[in-house]
Structures are given as C-alpha cells and as structure tokens.
Amino acid sequence: MASLRDIKQRINSTKKTKQITKAMEMVSAAKLNRSQEKAQSFLPYTDKIREVVASIAASDTDVSHPMLEERPVKKTGYIVITSDRGLAGAYNSNLIRGLLYTINKRHKSKDEYGIFAIGRTGRDLLKKRQLPIISEMTGLSDQPTFNDIKDIAKQTVDMFADEVFDELYIWYNHFVSPIKQDVTEKKVLPLTDLSDTKVSTTYEYEPNEQVILEALLPQYAESLVYGALLDAKASEFAARMTAMSAATDNATNLIDELTLSYNRARQAAITQEITEIVGGAAALE
C-alpha cells in the first residue's frame, strides 16, 4: 500500500499536470477562434473564382484547358496535411489510416503515386512506412499565410500541368464543430465538378475567356490547397482543445480518487496510532 507521502506527491504532480492541460486547452480555444475566422474570410475568394471559372466553362465559347479535362490516370498526387505537434487526440492517426487504406486499395505499386507532406507528424509516419514523398513542408505558423505554402502549392499544380500527375487529391481534416472533425479527401485537379456551381452573375471578359481561364485556373487550384490548410488548422486546434479538456477532466477525477485514498490512509494511520496507545495503556494497568 502506498504511503501517505507517496499519495501526496502524486496529488501534487497531478495538480501540476492539470494546470498545464487546462492552459493548453485555453490556448487552443483562442487559436481555434482565430483560425475559424481566417478560414471563413477566405471562402468568398475561392467561391468567386470558382463561379467565374464555371461561368466560362459553361459558356458557348470554344474554350478548353488541361485542368478541366480528365485523362487516363497513370500517376496520382496526394497532398497530405497533418500537424507539426501532437497532443491532438486522433487528429493525425485517423487521417493517415484513411490515406493508407485508400492508397492500398487504389494503387498496386509505389510508382503509381507521390505524396506532398505538409506537417511533421504525417511526414514522419509516411517516411517510416517508406512511402514516396516528393516534397515536404514543416514548421508552418499557427496562422499561415498563402505565401507560406505558395511554393508547394505551385509545385503540385505545375506537376499536374506537366503531366507528371494525372490527378491530384488533398487529404485533410475538415472542421465540422469543436468536437467533430472529418477526414476529407478532395479532388483538386482536374476540375470536373463545376457543373453544380451556381452562377449568379453574367460576366464579360477582356481580352477573352481563354486568357482569363488560363490565368485563373492555376490560382484557383492553389487556393484550394490554402483553403484546405486553413480548414485543417481549425480542426487541429479543435482536436487539441478537446483532447486537453478530456485530459483536464481525467486529472480532476484522479485527484479526487487520490485525495480519497489519502484521507482513508490517514484515517487508518490515526486509528492504528490510537489502537497502539490504548493497547499500551492497557498493558500498564
């Protein structure tokens, strides 16, 4: 049975841990609010570009672009967004598990796909399994700007344009609510799902639709990567906030249990002392 000193040390240690997890929960909540605001403010930009592209694609003019056309798939590119740090519950593991399942189901060899890893945790897990990582990016800030990922986003789009890849997907955790984040696979290229986009305005283009399309499509594809990153950041902070909240609750329960054990042990020790005193007094009579 643990001594009173041991139990007291465990109580103090758990209280310190609780202070840390509570602080991390509050920090994550603040970062979540900022990330949500940033992700929401970026949506109108991507929505408007998508509307313009859809308007051109649906027009009667004879315009075309490789990014709008499907071709036989020989190689697939995957952009995988995870976090640099842990303590976020199953945020990273669920995504990597889903990605590996899809890759094993979709491809027969490593020559059929390549991975762009954003985030240290995912990169390390994928490297451990010796998967083909073409490019990686770690150390992004909690509130990343487009310039932070411009190079890797442009690289993925350029490799599709150069037909290194015939299709490009992005994997990330989509923010649903502070307690729910969904592993999501979104097709970035080719853009074949524009028909369901509502076009609310009639546009006139200068110099012509083809020139506008060639300028907008790469920007739109790159913006999809950045938008997914902002969404993933919000999901990361939500997952970490939830994980730290659960850890704080567990610490509270453990402190209650240890305090009860301490009081019982202390009561038993006092009872034992009284018994010994009474027994000693009786022996002297």
UniProtKB/Swiss-Prot annotation:
Keyword match Transport: yes
Topology term for the membrane: Peripheral membrane protein
Oligomer and partners: F-type ATPases have 2 components, CF(1) - the catalytic core - and CF(0) - the membrane proton channel. CF(1) has five subunits: alpha(3), beta(3), gamma(1), delta(1), epsilon(1). CF(0) has three main subunits: a, b and c.
Chief place where the protein resides: membrane
GO MF annotation, one: proton-transporting ATP synthase activity, rotational mechanism
InterPro entries xrefs: ATP_synth_F1_ATPase_gsu (IPR035968), ATP_synth_F1_gsu (IPR000131), ATP_synth_F1_gsu_CS (IPR023632)
GO BP field: proton motive force-driven plasma membrane ATP synthesis
GO cellular component, one term: proton-transporting ATP synthase complex
CDD domains: F1-ATPase_gamma
Gene expressing this chain: atpG
Keywords from the UniProt entry: ATP synthesis, Cell membrane, CF(1), Hydrogen ion transport, Ion transport, Membrane, Transport
Subcellular localization(s) per the UniProt record: Cell membrane
Protein name listed in UniProt: ATP synthase gamma chain
Function: Produces ATP from ADP in the presence of a proton gradient across the membrane. The gamma chain is believed to be important in regulating ATPase activity and the flow of protons through the CF(0) complex.
A Pfam family hit: ATP-synt
Family according to the record: Belongs to the ATPase gamma chain family.
